[in-house]
């Protein structure tokens, strides 16, 4: 079937769009990809919604700015999908399903609470295609972490690689997560810790820029190794997989007074150290690490990962013919296809749910 995936991640950069052809088990073709960036005003609204979401106790409540943010997210996704299909000459009749993740504003699996804003019914009416949404709720309700969801897609991609031995796919968005794949049977996944969120927030605060482009600011700085070592003592890092995080889990960690470059270098090293720290908790040492997400564009982060993970290889997913930028959008197209067929999206080894769980709900035009 033909599926389009839509993803707005915790980095708050914009909406990624991707088309894939899949039967929900294997990927037969990767189609075009697209991107609709958020404006500064839209990003500011999302940051406000994230701050206010910390007070939520029910997943359907939309107090304060959350209602306005939900409308904005829905319209942005409708615009992204419409522009994408028009640009690539894709008829809506040829699209079987759209996978719509929405925007996560709160993720507290211990409280069985995960909140993604975005009106799937309104989106389905706007684009006139069935929309699969609400991918995390069933897993969380059944006692799982509800994250990460992308590992089953990583496994499908890895099946096409001519590689022996275990490998790891690391997605570095607002939060970092890993998929450990060893053959067809072993799939282990978890969040590893911070991704770009802490760094992006810091860079915005000190420079007005939304992120550290290519890691150039961090490349000019010195890492405060003592601060990183102390931050890595957080109990999350010693817990075995599966485990997951809210975007703002480490927001309370205060950097000492550092220059912008030193602060960026230190937070980049924190992300790299957290990813490398998962290795002792895995069954075997991965022979290769494939990096996706916005972090794959951060050359300082890639350099630190290569230093910490040697002698294993560390490579950008683009080098394999995958898409580092559109990986999660592709994944939600894939997950929508799996959901349509009632196939599992999550497993005990990926989210801690007791039994393999399907998920997602359909909104029809």
UniProtKB/Swiss-Prot annotation:
NCBIfam families the UniProt entry points to: PRK09585.1-5
**What exactly does this protein do?**
Catalyzes the specific phosphorylation of 1,6-anhydro-N-acetylmuramic acid (anhMurNAc) with the simultaneous cleavage of the 1,6-anhydro ring, generating MurNAc-6-P. Is required for the utilization of anhMurNAc either imported from the medium or derived from its own cell wall murein, and thus plays a role in cell wall recycling.
One Pfam family cited in the UniProt record for this chain:
AnmK
For this protein, what is the EC number? 2.7.1.170
Query: Which species expresses this protein natively?
Result: Rhodopseudomonas palustris (strain BisB18)
According to UniProt, this protein's pathway is: Amino-sugar metabolism; 1,6-anhydro-N-acetylmuramate degradation; Cell wall biogenesis; peptidoglycan recycling
Keywords attached to this Swiss-Prot or TrEMBL record, sorted alphabetically, are:
ATP-binding, Carbohydrate metabolism, Kinase, Nucleotide-binding, Transferase
Enzyme's top EC category: transferase
Top-rank lineage group of the source organism: Bacteria
Q: Which GO terms describe its molecular function?
A: ATP binding; kinase activity; phosphotransferase activity, alcohol group as acceptor
Binding annotation for ATP: 9-16
Protein family per UniProt:
Belongs to the anhydro-N-acetylmuramic acid kinase family.
Give the protein's recorded name.
Anhydro-N-acetylmuramic acid kinase
| Catalytic activity, as annotated | 1,6-anhydro-N-acetyl-beta-muramate + ATP + H2O = N-acetyl-D-muramate 6-phosphate + ADP + H(+)
The processes (GO biological process) annotated in the record are: 1,6-anhydro-N-acetyl-beta-muramic acid catabolic process; amino sugar metabolic process; peptidoglycan turnover
State whether keyword Lipid biosynthesis applies. no
Identify the taxonomic lineage of the organism of origin: Bacteria, Pseudomonadati, Pseudomonadota, Alphaproteobacteria, Hyphomicrobiales
């Amino acid at each position: 079937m033909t599926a389009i995936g839509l993803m707005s991640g915790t980095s708050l950069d914009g909406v990624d769009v991707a088309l894939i052809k899949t039967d929900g088990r294997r990927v037969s073709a990767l189609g075009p990809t697209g991107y609709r960036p958020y404006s500064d005003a839209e990003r500011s609204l999302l940051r406000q919604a994230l701050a206010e979401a910390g007070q939520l106790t029910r997943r359907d409540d939309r107090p304060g700015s959350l209602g306005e943010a939900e409308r904005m997210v829905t319209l942005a996704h409708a615009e992204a999908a419409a522009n994408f299909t028009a640009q690539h000459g894709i008829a809506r009749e040829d699209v079987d399903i759209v996978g719509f993740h929405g925007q996560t504003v709160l993720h507290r699996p211990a409280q069985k609470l995960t909140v993604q804003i975005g009106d799937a019914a309104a989106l389905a009416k706007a684009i006139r295609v069935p929309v699969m949404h609400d991918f995390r709720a069933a897993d969380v309700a059944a006692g799982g972490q509800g994250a990460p969801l992308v590992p089953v897609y990583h496994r499908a991609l890895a099946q096409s690689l001519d590689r022996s031995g275990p490998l790891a796919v690391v997605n570095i968005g607002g939060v970092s997560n890993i998929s450990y794949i060893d053959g067809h049977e072993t799939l282990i996944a978890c969040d590893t810790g911070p991704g770009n969120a802490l760094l992006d927030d810091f860079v915005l605060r000190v420079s007005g820029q939304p992120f550290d482009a290519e890691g150039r600011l961090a490349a000019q700085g010195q890492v405060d190794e003592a601060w990183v070592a102390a931050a890595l003592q957080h109990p999350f890092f010693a817990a075995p997989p599966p485990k997951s995080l809210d975007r703002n889990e480490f927001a309370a960690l205060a950097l000492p007074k550092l220059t912008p470059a030193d602060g960026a270098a230190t937070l980049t090293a924190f992300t790299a150290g957290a990813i490398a720290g998962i290795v002792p908790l895995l069954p075997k040492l991965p022979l290769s690490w494939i990096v996706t997400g916005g972090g794959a564009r951060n050359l300082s982060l890639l350099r630190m990962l290569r230093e910490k993970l040697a002698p294993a290889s560390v490579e950008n997913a683009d080098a394999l013919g995958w898409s580092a930028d559109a990986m999660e959008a592709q994944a939600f197209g894939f997950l929508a296809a799996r959901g349509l067929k009632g196939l599992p999206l999550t497993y005990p080894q990926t989210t801690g749910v007791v039994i393999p769980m399907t998920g997602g709900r359909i909104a029809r035009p």
